[in-house]
Amino acid sequence: MNKIRLVVASLLLGAATGFAQKPFNASGTGNPIIPGYFADPTVKKFGDTYYMYATTDGSGAGFGPAQVWTSKDFVNWTLMPMNWPDSHWIWAPDVMKHTDGNYYYFYCQPCMIHCGVSETPRGPWKNILGESEAVLVPDRFVTNAITLDGQTFVDDDGSVYLYWGTWGIYKGFGCGAGKLASDMKSFTETRLIPNTEATDFFEAPFVMKRKGIYYFMYSSGSCHDHTYRVQYATSDKPMGPYTYRGCILETNTDGTIHGPGHHSVLKEGNEYYMVYHRHDNPHSNRGFHRQLCVDRMEFAEDGSIKPLIPTHDGIGALASSVVKSKNLALGAKVRASSFYDADFRPEYAVDDNNGTLWRPRGMGQEWIEMDLGVARQIQTIWTQFEYGTQFYQYLIETSVDGKHWSVFADKRNNRMAGSPMVDFGKVKARYVRLTFTGGQKNGFGGAVWNLKIFEGVEASAPQQWLGLTAADWNGREWQNNEGMLGGAFTLKEGSARIQRIGGRDALVLEPGTTLEYSHPLLSSSKEHTVSGLVYRSGKWQSYEAGSCLSSGAITLHSSTEPLVITNFRYYNWKQEAAEKAYDAETDIVRLPVADQQKHGLVVSLSADDFVVNDTVPYLENRGVKGYFEARKLPLVVKEVKGKKAFHFEGTQVYTSSFMLPATLQDNAPYTLEAWVLNDSISENECVADFTTSHDELEKIMLVNGTEPRCGVINHYGWYEDAGYKDMKELAGKWQHIYICFDGRMEQVYINGKLVSEKDIQLLVKPSQFITLGRNAEGDWPFTGYLHSLKLWDEYLPLKE
């Protein structure tokens, strides 16, 4: 989508509606309220804290991980990881506090609802029925209600109701509803709310009560496009029957608020606020890069809901701001090593807008530099990377003159995900430079929603400041790679080593050894939690580490006996007892860093290396080391229309002796080139399957078929696959197929003609081998000729 057109349309819309609507890419917009891709929000206020539970979007089809966003002011949000759910899909979470004092967490997978329980709204959670994926509501638990999108409602008498449903548009279908028993494990009453009461009901029910009226709200249309919208019906009973009242939220005129829906409602005093998701700008393919927004609801005197006018402004703060310093980066002059295109300019990193971001052109080390105009004191820098649920590695430097640079924060070994990433220091500087150096996943690069620079110490974000495992010991330092503060424990005296003991890797401090971690923000007088695990008397025990904390330092010392320790943690907030107990028995997860050591040419096969009529049981790979071996029947080399070619007759299948390199995992850029001739092209024929996994978006499969949706390249993604509608016309002709993907856009060429170009996202997993002649599942046999095949683990645009 062209952003210039969108801005002009936004301005015209504001004039037409009589108020000054901010353009979606203006500085300081209040919507989206979260920097990242999230959907299906449930917002709750427990105590003085707002909690935002949502589907993790932008990761395929809601594949997690589990998380919650928290805020004290409804403007500055912090991402906090949760232990559960740990399932493949984590969709549409909802949390409620029961009269028993516990919190209940409902979420769904297709097509079932699960329920967890915890003593805190952050967890740790456990399935109320025992096993992690035990099902509370199976599919069609209520006849003709497809189970999805569970949402609770608590009535004035304390009764708890659950509503659920999707694809409720069919005749006789609708939304499931049930009154939960006091144990929250069963229902005392159920009913189908049919689509004759809730017109066009598709999914995402939400029920609230106001002045004796029950409002049954829901989403209609397709969540992938502009038709998604919110409608509602009313009743005088929580289970209905309901009377349809109309649509209250839909795509705006200029399309910058696109496909709004799957909402929840926050009541604050006498005000009601609708929190919903909408598609990103510019709109991503598939519609699974959604963002969270909020707007005020209004009611007419008769109790009907007035149609919402969705805004880019949002509602602002609902409490005093936790941030006390001015954002020095806002509107600063900025330059960068590169930017993807005009939709992702460097200026978008300093506009305090959660809907715009700077995206560098490449996936390697890229930088962005801010000029504050004059030298200013800097004590805190917040960085909100594109994906807060995965870790980034980076370096922040400062300079007075733009020539001589000093390190402000070195996170080049960081393995902690979070948003914002918070770095502290104390320096006077005019220039600030952020350099992305790597991270958890390939193909995501160092894109940034916002960079915020503060003169004061801004430490309000509740985070894990220290997180250390035995693997973080490098022989001289114990590096804080899983903690927000970075840095390291330094060896002051003695010696330490890594040892496997009691089923865990541990750091052993020999007698007389002292390690010290220094940071000015550490203090026993400030709210905190510090803990670890130590091995004593033949078992692992909680380490009450409070005594090791002093003003500005943590000191670990072993006296006459070794100190065997791991999982050392420090939080800048006070954990509840359940959270402490969970940490006492749970290891810190230390995820690997994505492999960025490119190989270049990974696969290279050519029939020109053989003589016509050769029988070829082995194909030497001239890319990375290795070969392809026939499983049964070997190929024969033929001469076809001026080219030597391997003749596949549907029975030949080859597998590689090597794995797909890790540099091609996740969303990594790649380039694929092949010469193929097929006399009789079937619907789906697999030339080469480069992956052994078989889940959504995990495939890189070269296909030669007539299927217009996926007949050229198949990723197991309905929107991401690509075909060619005129493929039948190429039967009996040589096809030069060239596919290149830069981590965002994939171009597909056949004989030099661009047949597909769209933004996609891949989730390629480790693959044990590459398959020729069929896919890894043994289907889609290829019956044709292959002259050559090449695969690179880098983006190489097609040259004219």
Could you tell me what each predicted segment is?
Residues 518-519, 711-736:
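Short, aromatic/His-centered strand-loop micro-motif at the edge of beta-sheets
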Residues 465, 474-481, 490, 500-502, ...:
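Extracellular glycan-recognition modules
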Residues 21-199, 209-255, 270-271, 277-321, ...:
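Beta-rich carbohydrate-recognition and catalytic domains
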Residues 297, 381, 396, 451-453, ...:
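Extracellular beta-strand elements of beta-rich domains used
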Residues 287-291, 439-448, 558-567, 747-749, ...:
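Extracellular carbohydrate recognition
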Residues 302-305, 311-351, 361-362, 386-397, ...:
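Juxtadomain low-complexity/linker regions and immediately adjacent membrane-anchoring helices
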Residues 546-563, 758-785:
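Flexible glycan-contacting loops in extracellular carbohydrate-active proteins
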Residues 351-461, 572:
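Aromatic, loop-rich ligand-recognition surfaces of beta-strand-rich domains
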